[in-house]
Amino acid sequence: MFKKVENKVHFPQLEEKILQFWNHNKIFEKSMKQREGCEEFTFYDGPPFATGLPHFGHFVPNTIKDIIPRYQTMKGKNVKRYFGWDTHGLPVEYEVEKSLKLSGRYEIEQYGIDKFNEECRNIVLRYTKEWKKIITRLGRWVDFENNYKTMDLTFMESVWWVFKTLYNKGLIYESYYVLPYSPKLATPLSNFEVNLGEYKEIHDPSLTIKFKIKDKNEYLLAWTTTPWTLPTNLGIAVGKDIDYSKVVDQEKNEIYIIGTKRLNHYYQDENKYVIIEQFKGEHLKGIEYEPLFDYFVNQRNKGAFKIHTAEYVTTDDGTGIVHIAPFGEEDYQILKKNTQTDMITPIDAECKFTSEVKDFEGLFVKDADNKIIEKLKSMNLLFKRENYLHRYPFCYRTNSPLIYRPISSWFVNIEKIKEKLIRSNEQINWIPEHLKKGRFGKWLENARDWAISRNRFWGNPIPIWKCSKTGNKICIGSREELEKLSGQKIIDLHKDKIDKITWPSKYGGTYVRTSEVLDCWFESGSMPYASKHYPFKDKDKFQNIFPADFIAEGLDQTRGWFYTLTILGTALFEKTAFKNVIVNGLVLSSDGKKMSKSLKNYTDPIQIINTFGADALRLYLIMSPVIKADDLKYSDDGVKDVLKNIIIPIWNAYSFFITYAIIDKFTPNNYVNLYKTNILDKWIISEIESLKQILNEEIDKYNLTKSIEVLLTFIDKLNNWYIRRSRRRFWKSENDNDKIDAYETLYYTLKNLMLMLAPFIPFLTEEIYQNLKTKNEKESIHLNNYPQSIKELINIELEEKMNFTRKVITIARALRASHNIKIRKPIKTIYIITKNHKEQNTLREMTEIILEEINAKEIKIKSNEEELVTYKAKANFKELGSKLGTNMKSVALAITKLSNEDILEIINGNKHTITINNNTYDITLKDIILERHERKNLKVINEDSITIGLDTLITEELYLEGLSRELIRKVQNLRKESNFNVTDRIILYTNNDEILTKIINNFENYIKTETLAITIEINNKKALTTLELDEEISVNIGIEKCLN
């Protein structure tokens, strides 16, 4: 029934074969079809950009997004998995700009927006075939055919509906704000887009400027790190309660006003200035000063060029006096609150000075810094120049510094719904949990209004038309609305098409669309609705699949997709858009740096899959810190270790079973009797039923970390305990009930383990299942139901007994290893000390197993350690110091002189009285530090409540037995080297050696049984292989396959 299995297998090739099987037999499609009409499990797939290839950062969420849907499908749910593509926005435009060698908004407009958008449309799906190939090779099942794209007409129309719904609720408004702005892209960014970029350490000029007070020969010393904003200076800010000094500069003979605490920074020599007056900042409020430049002197009659008080001013650096221009958010708010100045923004879309600032016209603002400094120096207004090192945000797409500037933009009013957003967050199950109140929760608490408009071209246009005469606005929520108002057929909603659509206003003007497009994050946040063309299609069905049961993405999406989903879900329906989310961390290169193609600091992921297999990579990622939203320093060796320590051991367990099942012609029945008599069978069956219970509970809670932990623990128990302890049951020649029980138990265990592992490592489990399944079973492992626990087969008491037994054996083996006593060398006695009667009974029940595993002849179970150790004691100064005072040294000395019997009395819970200088002290166990001293020929170890001792006195009989075991190991290795089959019987030849003769005389039957030798013959001519049995003992042996 079973196909022969090779011990060595190339897993990537095996996976390619399984992919062909899935494709040829349409297994994914069948898995979906068989769940039609079942309970829906809603999963949202966040849309990636297809303008680049997937990397390790994509592999983590894509693995998670495969595990959970596979599991839920096996649980009987209908899990639709539609891939999506983010096709609009800055990433696409930036790629096209580079390919067309265009620079900036003006050149794009000259090239033609219609042609530019067509180029965007052409490249936006450039790598979809590669994405499909790579994600499929990873083992992920997802529907690429029925995908959604944010540029689809139906998707864009639903986004308009979302926008209009928010607009009608009063949550959308247009206003001037100071926003982070990308000069190269010529568009503002939202505050969370800024966080997607990098903050870099940069040096900027730090200037102290002299502002002359109006009608006085006195100067304010103001500080700035943005010289380019000085031409638009409209005010000065001081701290209301900060102390200021008016000083005479003795060298320059000028009068300056400066924050008192900052005097020592500017004047290291106190003799260089004289303080003539001191006052609080409130005293300066309202004072006028002379503008540095004459560009905007006309703003004086609107409140410009005055001193204001502001809370953000400090004396931590600078002068305690700050210049105000409308290019900082706080500055802008002060001007807005205290003046009626015009919106002064003399820079163009690419942040170059316009003709309003004639001295620097055409210069990029940052490039103008030095010229502005030279100008101020020539005007004798530069007091001091320094360099200032600080962290500054860079554009996440162009890697160029952002500029903060006032700009007209459209916003979602987050302040209005902030409390609702916080309540929505309470409904979400975050994995890991700390994100709810931590990173995401705090982000919500401090969330600002969301700038959703972009001054770009390839995006979903903001659906607002304004009357050219009155400014009256009409918000459009569907194609039908636009067609009725314009009288034109709408077949494309992109900017180059609908900007041409206008209609006359009843007020005499014309309705023209506002020029901006939507932030692509608004589109991805609309994905739950737009991917279903809600509310234009299947409106009634939508409520059954919203919110999503599950989503998964990287940690950066706490300020991206997770955030926009939450905003729009709350704004539209006052509920979160998803119930459960698994958040992964970042995958970094092995040196902890960001993975970079240019630095070539990581291996191509496809090369990793082709070397180690996708299953190994999937497990490596899921087992790593990245699954807990922590960073992972990726290494190829880590994937290799997973292959070596997990994938191959699973294969070996399977290979072991198949090898002997074929030899013994074992044929499994559809029904397996699981009520076994052998303690190992009962134990492993109980363990796998417990595993089913735990896995179902943990995966239902989306706890993949715990799920993997218990799976790996079980694999270790299966391989290194059950199979290892049961080998002789499979080897023996007679097919008795015990052997049949072993086959049935291992078969049942392997098949159920494969079913449980299937969502995690879909390739290997499919391969093994195909050989294990019986005639009437499902075509693929992934068409099966997920295993459910048979409660009556769980024996917790037996599991605890076996776990305790294994713990004792592990401690004893560690003791042997620490004293270089090889496990093949038998010892006479193992002593196990525990006061716990339940543990003592377990040890008696498991005596045979313990003796075999420790290679000991007898076991002695005791309640006390007296037979193993003698005791010495030292004073516990930490405990005694506070209560003994001056007698501390004397008591400590007395404790070192306590007898073994005295210490035993203390160990048994009694007090021991020590008298010093007529003072008595009751000494208890916590007052002393115990030292155990091993008795002769004993090696002792203590761990928790267990003490183990090994009698290391080796008799000649024990010595010979140890050599026999070493001989058996060497023969087994020789069988492997000779490529003998595991069932091949052999003739074992030996030389005429005195020690070897003794070994054979004492242990002949044991050696024959273990090596499958039918006879052992002395034949010096055929015993040509020299083996070392011990450091001083070499023997010659030979083996020959028996042909009978």
Curated annotation (Swiss-Prot):
GO biological process annotation, one example: isoleucyl-tRNA aminoacylation
Domain of life: Bacteria
Stored Pfam families: Anticodon_1 (PF08264), DUF5915 (PF19302), tRNA-synt_1 (PF00133)
Database matches in Gene3D superfamilies: HUPs, Isoleucyl-tRNA Synthetase, Domain 1
Cofactor requirement: Zn(2+)
KW Cell cycle (keyword) present: no
Motif window: 'KMSKS' region: 594-598
SUPFAM superfamilies documented for this protein: Anticodon-binding domain of a subclass of class I aminoacyl-tRNA synthetases, Nucleotidylyl transferase, ValRS/IleRS/LeuRS editing domain
Coiled coil (residue ranges): none
Keyword Zinc attached: yes
Motif ('HIGH' region): 48-58
GO CC annotation, single: cytoplasm
EC number(s) recorded for this UniProt protein: 6.1.1.5
Compartments in which it is found: Cytoplasm
Catalytic activity: tRNA(Ile) + L-isoleucine + ATP = L-isoleucyl-tRNA(Ile) + AMP + diphosphate
Classification via PANTHER family: ISOLEUCINE--TRNA LIGASE, CYTOPLASMIC, SOLEUCYL-TRNA SYNTHETASE
Protein role: Catalyzes the attachment of isoleucine to tRNA(Ile). As IleRS can inadvertently accommodate and process structurally similar amino acids such as valine, to avoid such errors it has two additional distinct tRNA(Ile)-dependent editing activities. One activity is designated as 'pretransfer' editing and involves the hydrolysis of activated Val-AMP. The other activity is designated 'posttransfer' editing and involves deacylation of mischarged Val-tRNA(Ile).
Quaternary organization: Monomer.
UniProt remark on domains: IleRS has two distinct active sites: one for aminoacylation and one for editing. The misactivated valine is translocated from the active site to the editing site, which sterically excludes the correctly activated isoleucine. The single editing site contains two valyl binding pockets, one specific for each substrate (Val-AMP or Val-tRNA(Ile)).
Name used for this protein in its record: Isoleucine--tRNA ligase
Organism of origin: Borrelia recurrentis (strain A1)
Lineage: Bacteria, Pseudomonadati, Spirochaetota, Spirochaetia, Spirochaetales
Gene: ileS
